Swiss-Prot record:
Pfam families: Lyase_1. The gene is argH. GO terms for biological process: arginine biosynthetic process via ornithine; L-arginine biosynthetic process. It comes from the Bacteria. This is Argininosuccinate lyase.
Length: 431
């Protein structure tokens, strides 16, 4: 490993210790490399504004940073174990190509605010993706709720048959859930949309850095004012972003659970498209719902990443090397979470209900609640009506149909009044 930015003259570096210190940073930093380049360009512009760099030096740095970004995208430059991290790789390349101008670019900044700003830009992009995917899922669910509003579906509590429900209600539930997930991701985006560049190692520097310029140039909504809070927010903002992702993957886990049950032979309510199943290596008859099972497992990875960062934050104020581990947590957590969410809209759009199986699962007892409420409307005290309906639940469905039960469910949000216009207005507000 070469290009250790912190190495002191005459002090040898133990290779094993350095390998331990670096960990898998350089591999993880591939996620942040282009963001670090963008922030380096903005920082160089700010240095020129205060006289640290000449216009000529700024021009050379900007050109070389653009070339490095292009080389990285094309594979001509590989961020590998020759470098400690992305920051040292950028500085080494600039110094190699430009000499003193490359050695000047780190003036007024630390690797601490360098990774803070790169991570902040990365998180903004990831949160936008969470919001976009949640919005896509909500759109599929809204459209299907409209189209299948009157399709009877057995409603369950405790995984036991409970009341007559509808496909419209099932879809509307997921639509509202993912609208909220998009809102939460957007709100978290606003939290992290603050510029830490220029806070250095957490105590500022003796230079009049043009932080207003870097804030505008990098597209941040505001400046993160306090250098100490900039360091305190490392991990805190990552935790908030994982919580926003986790809201979506938590709902993903529950919808995957529903589909795991509904596609089983014991329920057979839903036909899963063949491309979302796999086979068994020994049982020729099997079509396994591996995709939805791994979707169901995804939230565990996101929750684990969140827990890792939460435990890392048992620290006093100021920078601590422990925080290096937060990078792996967010990279792995978002990789798993977004990969699963990417598949969800198409999966939901292609599910097929089996109306005959749905109707067959609606038994007489599922009308007992209707009977009790109707008696209460007629003047019978509800508790007495409840007891009478419970005693006669086996015959509660006599002369009744699922469609009539759904038509009578007029409370706002229930089967006869899904209020999809309200949900669609909330969805449109996300656009």
């Amino acid at each position: 490993m070469t290009n250790l930015l912190w190495q002191k003259p005459g002090v040898a570096v133990d290779a094993k210790i350095q390998t331990f210190l670096a960990g898998d940073d350089v591999i993880l930093d591939r996620e942040f490399f282009l963001y670090d380049i963008a922030a380096s360009k903005a920082h160089a512009q700010g240095l020129q504004h205060i006289g640290i760099l000449s216009l000529e030096e700024l021009g050379g740095l900007s050109e070389q940073l653009d070339l490095l970004a292009g080389d990285f995208r094309s594979g001509a430059f590989v961020l590998d174990a020759h470098y400690e991290d992305c920051h040292s790789a950028i500085e080494a390349r600039l110094t190699e190509r430009l000499g003193d101008a490359g050695r000047k670019i780190h003036t007024g900044r630390s690797r601490n605010d360098q990774i803070l700003v790169a991570t902040r830009l990365w998180l903004k992009d990831k949160l936008q993706r969470v919001a976009a995917l949640s919005t896509e899922v909500a759109k599929v669910a809204l459209d299907r709720a409209q189209a299948e509003a009157e399709l009877p579906v057995p409603g369950y509590t405790h995984i036991q048959r409970a009341v007559v429900s509808s496909a419209g209600m099932w879809w509307a539930g997921w639509a509202e859930a993912f609208i909220d997930n998009a809102v939460r991701a957007n709100d978290t985006f606003k939290l992290v949309d603050t510029n830490p560049l220029g806070t250095a190692a957490g105590y500022g520097v003796n230079l009049p850095l043009d932080r207003a310029h870097t804030t505008a140039e990098l597209g941040f909504a505001r400046l993160q004012v306090s250098p100490i809070y900039a360091q305190l927010s490392r991990g805190k903002f990552e935790l908030a972003a994982l919580e926003a992702l986790g809201g979506a993957t938590l709902d993903l886990r529950r919808i995957a659970w529903d589909l795991s049950l509904f596609t089983s032979g014991e329920f057979a309510f839903v036909a899963l498209p063949a491309q979302y199943t796999t086979g068994s290596s020994i049982m020729p008859n099997k079509r396994n719902p591996d995709v939805i099972e791994l979707m169901r497992a995804t939230h565990a990875s996101v929750a684990a990443a969140r827990t890792e960062i939460e435990q890392l934050l048992s620290l006093p104020s100021g920078y601590h090397r422990d925080l290096q581990s937060s990078k792996g947590a967010i990279v792995h957590g978002f990789a798993r979470g977004l990969a699963a969410l990417e598949l969800l809209p198409a999966l939901l759009a292609n599910l097929e209900w089996r109306p005959d199986k749905l109707r067959a699962a609606i038994d007489s007892g599922m009308y007992a609640t209707d009977v009790a409420v109707e008696a209460a409307v007629a003047g019978v005290p509800f508790r007495d009506a409840y007891k009478a309906a419970a005693a006669a639940s086996d015959s509660a469905g006599q002369g009744r149909t699922p469609e009539a039960s759904l038509a009578a469910r007029v409370s706002p949000g229930a089967a006869a009044d899904l209020q999809l216009d309200v949900l669609r207005a909330r969805w449109e507000a996300l656009q």
